[in-house]
Structure formats: structure tokens, C-alpha cells
């Protein structure tokens, strides 16, 4: 294989095919023949580029998964692909998760190795930049670990595909499963403990939360950063008081601890259920699945539902593949130090399938006589469903976006033979998007015949049950003795009490803002006399959303216009509520039943939470028939449609641009909120307040207003002129979602921006002599050679704005820019930045006010950047998990480590060197030397503890344990440091050479944070003292090793050790020690070792 960076063992492993040829004559014909033959042979060989980190502590280390690619290459070379009898090889580069180094390595692979495809990178730091360059160079890129989330849009990377299903997929499966099982209230519990290498919790948490929060009530969210059992129990205890259905988002190791904590808390009675999301981290659960005998496991496992791919758990073929990968990794060229099959990364299977999928695509294109070296054409072939593969990870089939979809199953612990196993009982079809029982004899009740209710019968706080009346023999006797008169009296009293209770309950509901503060008493609103309807309940006096085409009655509440006689025509009743002018949008009486639905209540709460200067404030809802209405802020200037209609002259561009900025800012906020989109953006839903600030309205509460989340397109009953702003892809749907889509909002914005540019109030197509239904029919016609759009004159606005409009109403939704890009274009088109309408009157003062928001945002970004700098600085002084706990104000408990290796070094003759140098020269010398050391140790799994003067202390095996790898890491690092020191030049003494002496020792230590002011992460124990003695008794330019470290290096293998003999060590007596002189395959120059220097000096 290609050469790799620094200390890794050489991977000289290439796979070639074809035959060698040579020229023995000088004739021109023979020379041309040889050139042609060599060209054909070169064409018959395909080189695969592979990027992954070497460091074994990384979850995607090549030492954990690289053999998966090697196995695939062997298969391809043993079973030739295509009519051209291709041969295959791969070249590996240690990406080190550094974007700059990875980019340089990729360029080198393309220019020197002539790679045909790149598999990787495995690090997100490098994925985006390499993906963009691969797309530019037309090189296929296969992402086998799901790190290309930034380039999932194939518009940016049209040569990229991803073998791992998107994380949103498992969120969709979870949503469908919860709906199928009838659970509505849930809690989310997850995180990553300090010792866990699982770093996907943030992305998976976001994907799950985005899917669930609009469909379910999330009663609690608990994030943890420590796996301590007491903290886990405390989190579970608080969550169990408000949730019975608990989603676990964590690694398998953490899940085991969480479930044990649940067992200790007694959450194993069957009233609680735990849904564990597992995409690949299956080592722990696979052990449970594979047991044939009765397994001893906590009772709480019976309440676990496992959501994982349908291929999950491993078939016999999967087990054989993992075993084969493990065996290959242990042998050259990888020579991995992993000690068991459990340490093999499950991503090795995706790596294997990535190459086979590429090879099969190459074969299909060769059969079709297409150029498989055309990366875009190759990816298009994949996305067109022309290539399928039955791989180790199951069926591999990509959609049109280059994303892979896998079927999922819901597993539960079920009886199997003499024991219990996790077996599937629900199956999710990723293409049909449906979930159904795994077998016909399983139903929604689950594998055990029943499942827990998502809440207690009386509620979590006993608030849904009345106190039961006392029972007993005495009461029975008294009841039987009651005479009819008393019975009548009791019934009358009961009726009176019930009426009183209902009256008080009604008052309670209205007076508790924590529960129903969005409910508004209709009597608390004072309707303005001139706008008060003649009688309540008449549709003509209301903003009736069910009849949006009625004269002067529209869905855009709070809008008015003036007639030519300056008579104000209000489009909705206006009133006073708590000192605010409010607009009332009346809803039909059938909405009374809808407000009780959980989905409607959830959306009401979302509307209450939306606070932005360009969003119409939502006050609440009146739920008292017949006056059911939505209450929002009243905007005095009406809608943008009214402003355009009533303007007697052409508005200034500053005037228009201010409105555009307000719309963009409002849409940016909405798209970032849980609502995700507006769905009805048009001039009549853009309201203008008394300060000439535009506010968006007309979104949300669709189910409450209309009784459904979709509207059915009806050719006869639809006012087609109201659809001019609706995107064509939505118009083609039979059921059009009220909420629309983000891309549809961009299209609506384009039409609206065009209305502003041309200042047209009667619709964007008023210059066309065609009926509205004909116009809509042309817009949604996908066969039209040129999509119908409104006229757009170039001289009406800035050319960049005109180009923006055309980009925003592109026929393909994927080609439309998002609102952040739109805002950036607006700033570029208006050099003065955002300018409000009143700027022309107030000059610089108003200009400052209009920029104030951007200044605050910039200062906030600077504050966040400075905060990140502080956090980054803290992370260089302390381990990351220690820094997080200190920032949170928590104490850090000391931790015991059973085995670590400690490195000490100092400079021989440093005191004399200091006497010959100025203090500034000494500081510069140490800074240059330690900067060199710091850069060198970055490639090793070590932790720099501290520096004191010329002493340098490093440890491996803490704060994150790495098994038996610590001695190997420290020894290799020591050889590197010794090598770079021999070439180090002292700035003010160029003729002098530093003489570094090093000591190593292996043993147990205790680590903890000491002090409050300038806290430090310190190590304690006899191991530290012994390592220091090894350094002080070492010789210049030598690595002195204790007997315990020597034993560890002999187990690791490949190191050159020379016995020094027995020496007297202060406080330890006679000790047998060794010199570390080299390592197999270590090509870096080291100082020569003489026997004279090995003589034992007098130890003080």
C-alpha cells in the first residue's frame, strides 16, 4: 500500500492484476505497440483510495475495520469483474482526522496513485472539504460511516453516496413504532459517559427529537455526561415520575448501566418500557441474542424494546465475516493489537459492501458500454435503482438522492427454546414507509400479549381521579334505609354540588396560567364599538377561515384597507385585551371538539412559544361557543397587499427592501422553529404594524382551523387566484399539506418578491389574459418545456435581486436556495446593509437602529467565539470531561487506573545551559522544544500531564483507558521524541546539542483534580515516583525502562530491549532495568548506543 504517516507499521499491501511487458527493439512500430499495451494494462487495474485514522483508540481506526476492504479486494481479484478482466488494489492513507493533512493525502492519491474511487474519509473534520473536491474532480466517493451529513444534498456533492442509512431514518421508525403501539407521552434519556467512545448521541438525539416533538408529548429530557450509577438513578427517578415510555439514546455499554440502574430502582414491574435505539453498536446485545442456554439477565430486560436494522443480531454469515476480519487484522499488513472479535468495528461490513457496490456498478456500466470512469454517470447509475447488492449489511439499494434505506425491526425479549432471546415482533418497510407485525399472530399488543400504558389511569400526580367515597357494611345499611324523599333531596344536592364543582373547575382552568394560559375568556375582550358585529355568530362579521373567498372576508385576520372615500374596511373584528389591540379570527363551532385533541394542543403551545419581531404575536384562543376564535396582535397598517394597493406612487427601493428583510428574517426564524415552514406565504399574510414593520401571519393551527393537516384540491371549489404563490410540486399533489415545505416557502417568497419589485397588488399574473384556473394548470404541468412564471423586468430592480428571484422559483425544489443564502445575497445587493423605511427621515440615527440587530448578533457571535476559545484553552489544560464538570460547577471525583505507563524526561546539563543564557533565551528554548514535543505526541494515544522547568511528563492509559496499548504508545512516542531531539537546534547556541534522557515505568495510579484556583489534573502513586527515578538514573540520549514496562513491551512485540543490569534506585533498592534501543520497522534515525555509555553511574 501507499506510504503512511510517521509511526505506523508499513502497509506494503497492493493487489495487482494483468501481466508485465517490455520492449526489446527500438523500432517505432514496436515502441507504439508497447505504449498501447501498457495503456491497456493500466486501464485494466483499478486503484481504490481509502482514508481512515490509524490510532486504535479512534472508533473508525483502520486497525479495527481495515480488513473489511482487504477481504472485498480479495473477492474481486478471485472473481474477476466485467468483460475487461479488471484487477483491483487499494492504497491507504492515515487521515489523522486533520482536514489539511487529509486533503493533501487525497490530492496525492489522485495525482500519484490515480485512484478511481475514494472510500472514506472516516472523520467528519475532513469529509466536507474532500467531498467537494471529489465532486469537482468527478471522482466517486463512498461514505461508509455516515460522516457526509454536510453533503447529503447531491446538488453540492453529485459524486457522493452513503452506505449508512441516515439517522433520520431511525427517528422515523421510532415515531411509527410509538404510533403503532398507541403511546403518546414519552421521555428521552441519553448521553455519553466519560469513558465511552460513542460520539453519535448529539446527531441521533436531534434526529429523534425532530421526529417526535410534533407528534408526541415529550414530558422529560435527561442528558448525562457521566456513567456513575448514582447519577443515572437520579435521572431515571425524576423521569419515572412523568414518563412510562423512555427512549434510550446511548451506546450499548451505557445502556447496560442504565438498565441496571432501572433494575435497582424497581422499574422492572412491567409498568415501564425502555426503547433502545441501536444502529450498529450491538456487541452487548448480540451476546444476549446469541445465547442458546438460559441467560441470567435483570428482569428489566423484559421491558426493553430494541429498534435496530432487520439484519441486526448477526446471521451466521455475519459472524463468519467478523471472525475473518479479526483474523486478517491481526496479520500483516495491519498487525492490529485488538484482542477479541468484539473490538472489530461493525463498520467494517459497510466498508466491505462499499467496494463491492462500486465494483458491481462498474460491471453494469461495462456491460452497457458506458464509461465507468465518469464519476457522475456512475453515481447516476447507482441512484437510478439499476444496481443492487446483497451485502454483509443486507440488501444495498440507494434512492435518487444517493441515500441508503434499510428495513428496521422492533425486537423484544421472547421465549426461544430453553432460554430467551431478543426476537422481532414489528417490521418497518423503509420504502413503503409502513410498520406491521413481524408475524400474523403478533398484533399491536406486542409479543407478550399486552404492553404498559403510557400514563397511569389517574395520571402521574393522581389528578385525573376523584376521591372514592367510603364503603362498608354500615353505609350499605344506611343506603337501603333511605326513603324516597331523602333520595330526591340527595339527587338535588348532588346536582347542585356538581354544578358548583363544574363552575369552580372552569374558573380553575382559566386561572392557572401554567396549564391553560393560552385560553382567553371572550368576555375579557372589549370589542371596539365601530367594529362590533351586530350579533355574535354571524359569518359575515367574522374572519371565517372556512370561507376564504367571501367578499371582505379573508383568512388574513387583522387586515384592513381604505376605499376611495377613505372609509376603513376592516377584514376582522378588533378589540382590546389586557391593554393590547387584538384581531379576532373566528372559527366555526365545530372547532370546539378539535381543541381537545393532543395534536392541536401541542400546536397551540408551539404558537405560544414563537416570539420574534417579524412574527405576529399570538395571544391565545377563545374556546367558548359560538365565539371560538384565534386572538393575535392587531396590525394597524393592514397587510402588504393593502399597502401595495393603496400606494399612489412608486415606492422607494429602500421601502421595498425593508419589507423584504422583514420577510426573510421572519422566515429564517420559522424555518428554525419546530413548525419548520410557513405553508401560506403571500402578500395578504404579511401584516404591517404602525411602525411600518412587517410581521408574518397565516401559519400554524391548521388542524384546529380546518380539521385536518391537508387540503384536498378541488377544481370547482378552489379559488385559484389564492394559489399563485404555491409551489408547483405542491400543486401536483392530490392532498396538499397546509404546512407546506421549506422549499415551497422559497418559491412563495420569489413570487412575493416579484410582487414587491413590480408593486402589483392584484396578483403576479394580472398582465396575463387568462383565467386563474388556466394559469394554475400551466404552472403545475410538469411537461411544459418552459415553466410558467410571472413577468420579471430587468430594469425594475438590482440585477442580483432579479437573479435571486429566478433562482428561488426554480422548477426543481433542490435547486432553490435556502433563506440563509437569500439573506446573504440581499446583503451583497445592498451595500449599506438593511435599511428601514424611516431611514430617509431619520438619517444616521435610524441607520444605526436598523443595524443594531446585526451588531448585537455579531457581538453575540464574538461572545460565543470567545467562550469557545476559553473552553478550548481549558481542554488543553484539563481532560475534556473534567473541564465540562468544572464549568458546570460540579466536583471531580478521583479515579483509580489499574495500569498506565508514565514518561519522564529532562535535559542533561540544563542548569549549566541556563547559566550561559539570558532568561528570555531560556524561555524561547523551552517553548521551541516543547512545541516540537507537543506536535509529535499528537499522533499517539497519550495525555500530556505537565511540564516543570525542563521536565516533561506524559502518560498513556488515562484519562481514557486503552487496554494494554499504553506501553506500546509511550514507547513509540519516546523513540520519536528522542529522534526529533537529536536534530533540534538551539537558536542562540547553534553548535550545542540537547541531550534528552528518558525514563518509563508501568503500574497503577490515582488521577484527580487538585485545587480550586488554577486546578490541575494530577497523578498520584508509587508509579509516578518510580518513573521519575527511571528518568533521573538514565543516561543522555537514552530511554531507561523499568522491568514492568519491559514486560509489557515484550508482550506487545517488535521492540528492541537491552538489559542494563541491576542498579540501585533511591527508595527502591536494587532494580533490574533495560534500555529501549529501537523498534521493528522504525525508520526514523536514533542516536547510536555504546557499551561505555551503558555503564551504571553512581546513583545518589
UniProtKB/Swiss-Prot annotation:
Protein name: Guanylate cyclase 2G
Family annotation (CDD domains): CHD (cd07302), PBP1_GC_G-like (cd06372), PK_GC (cd13992)
One MF annotation (Gene Ontology) recorded for this entry: guanylate cyclase activity
Positions in the Extracellular compartment: 44-481
Superkingdom, natural source: Eukaryota
Membrane-crossing segments per the record: 482-502
Lineage: Eukaryota, Metazoa, Chordata, Craniata, Vertebrata
PROSITE patterns (alphabetical): GUANYLATE_CYCLASE_1, GUANYLATE_CYCLASE_2, PROTEIN_KINASE_DOM
E.C. number: 4.6.1.2
Quaternary structure note: Homooligomer. May interact with NPR1/GC-A.
Record note on modification: N-glycosylated.
Residue ranges that the UniProt entry lists as topological domain Cytoplasmic: 503-1100
Keyword GTP-binding: yes
Residue ranges of every copy of the Protein kinase domain listed in the record: 549-826
Gene Ontology BP term (one): intracellular signal transduction
Family to which the UniProt record says this protein belongs: Belongs to the adenylyl cyclase class-4/guanylyl cyclase family.
InterPro entries: A/G_cyclase, A/G_cyclase_CS, ANF_lig-bd_rcpt, ANPR/GUC, Cyclic_nucleotide_synthase, Kinase-like_dom_sf, Nucleotide_cyclase, Peripla_BP_I
Tissue: Expressed in lung, kidney and skeletal muscle. Low levels in intestine.
Gene designation per UniProt: Gucy2g
PANTHER family per the UniProt record, alphabetical: GUANYLATE CYCLASE 2G, GUANYLYL CYCLASE
Keywords: Cell membrane, cGMP biosynthesis, Cytoplasm, Glycoprotein, GTP-binding, Lyase, Membrane, Nucleotide-binding, Receptor, Signal, Transmembrane, Transmembrane helix
Leader peptide range in chain numbering: 1-43
Annotated GO CC locations: cytoplasm; plasma membrane
Reaction(s) catalysed (UniProt annotation): GTP = 3',5'-cyclic GMP + diphosphate
Glycosylation sites: 55, 85, 94, 418, 443
Domain Guanylate cyclase positions: 901-1031
